[in-house]
Regions:
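Alpha/beta-hydrolase fold nucleophile elbow
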Residues: 112-129
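Hydrolase active-site cap/lid region
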Residues: 142-190
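Short beta-strand/loop motif that positions the catalytic acidic residue
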Residues: 212-213, 219-221, 225
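Short alpha-helix in the alpha/beta-hydrolase fold that links the catalytic acid
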Residues: 49, 215, 229-238
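Catalytic active-site module of serine/aspartate enzymes centered on a nucleophile-bearing elbow/loop
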Residues: 251, 255, 259-285
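Alpha/beta-hydrolase active-site loop
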Residues: 85-117
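Short, surface-exposed "cap/lid" segments of acyl-processing enzymes
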Residues: 27-72
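N-terminal cap/lid segment of alpha/beta-hydrolase-fold proteins
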Residues: 1-28
């Protein structure tokens, strides 16, 4: 029987609570742990992510997913993007620190409702989608507790290559708005996002950090990805030549999913990505 447990963490620096959940099948034996990170404008309960959790639980993993603290989702709220002010104050260091706090909590008995005997934390794996892929690569590089990483449709660089004129206008106005096509919202991005990136470049420069990544890496990308081109996967592969690259011929950026996702099964491309990822993790010594 699949068990689903929800819990809340609070960032010690920013004081903002954020939700996480774990899905698993109790077998009486410690199980490897997969932590899944959503991307830009995403959240832990988007679309088919709940079915992903069930799939990995059926494969013998404890599957943990979280809402980043400043992704716009409110604990106890609608479950969708609603706190646009928080969204606007998100930055890459916050995301890394939120993920790090979750990893710390998993290693701290009593910090989550999960029994310590359930977790085989010597087999701790990360999956990141889209921008979340870039974040999990950086986190693995700074946290040796991570055993291996898989990215799905990951960006090759957190630097969006803002043109100089856009940066200048953004700095003058203090805020830049980007559309959320799904909801029709105009999402604010405060200039602190750019300031945070440039102030912490040694930590956030993925092209310079990825070649030093020691953990095994699986790169999964769709050939028809309409948001992050397939060239990003080739760039990541060039920076870490020993990474395994899986190209799915039929996988758009969200691997066939949509929000809400009403079907009882995973979309085909998402299942293909999940099957290969589960096998990749299970095959590691």
């Amino acid at each position: 029987m699949i068990t689903h447990v929800e819990f809340t963490l609070t960032g010690p620096a920013h004081g903002r609570p954020f939700a996480a959940d774990a899905t698993y099948q109790a077998t009486g034996q410690p199980q490897p742990v997969v932590v899944f990170l959503h991307g830009f404008k995403g959240f832990k309960d988007w679309g088919h992510f709940g079915l992903l959790a069930d799939f990995f639980a059926e494969q013998g993993f404890v599957f943990v997913k979280l809402n980043l603290s400043h992704n716009g989702v409110v604990v106890g709220g609608t479950g969708d993007l609603e706190d646009l002010e928080a969204f606007g104050h998100n930055n890459f260091c916050l995301e890394l620190d939120d993920l790090g706090q979750l990893l710390d909590a998993l290693h701290t008995p009593g910090a989550t409702p999960l029994p310590p005997t359930l977790l085989d934390l010597k087999r701790l794996y990360l999956i990141g989608h889209s921008r979340g892929g870039g974040i999990v690569l950086l986190k693995a590089g700074e946290d040796p507790r991570v055993r291996a990483v898989a990215t799905w449709a990951a960006v090759a660089d957190l630097h969006p290559r803002w043109p100089a004129e856009i940066l200048a206008d953004w700095q003058r106005a203090g805020v830049l708005h980007v559309p959320n096509v799904r909801t029709g919202q105009q999402l604010p991005l405060y200039y602190q996002l750019a300031e945070n990136y440039f102030a912490h470049l040694p930590r956030l420069d993925l092209p310079s950090r990825l070649p030093r990544l020691r953990q095994p890496l699986l790169l999964v990308h769709g050939e028809p990805d309409e948001t992050v081109p397939l060239t990003a996967a080739y760039q990541l592969k060039n920076q870490k030549p020993d990474a395994e690259l899986l190209i799915l011929s039929d996988a758009p950026h969200n691997f066939g999913g949509a929000h809400p996702w009403l079907a009882a099964q995973l979309p085909g491309p998402a299942r293909a990505a999940a099957e290969r990822t589960a096998a990749f993790f299970a095959g590691l010594a």
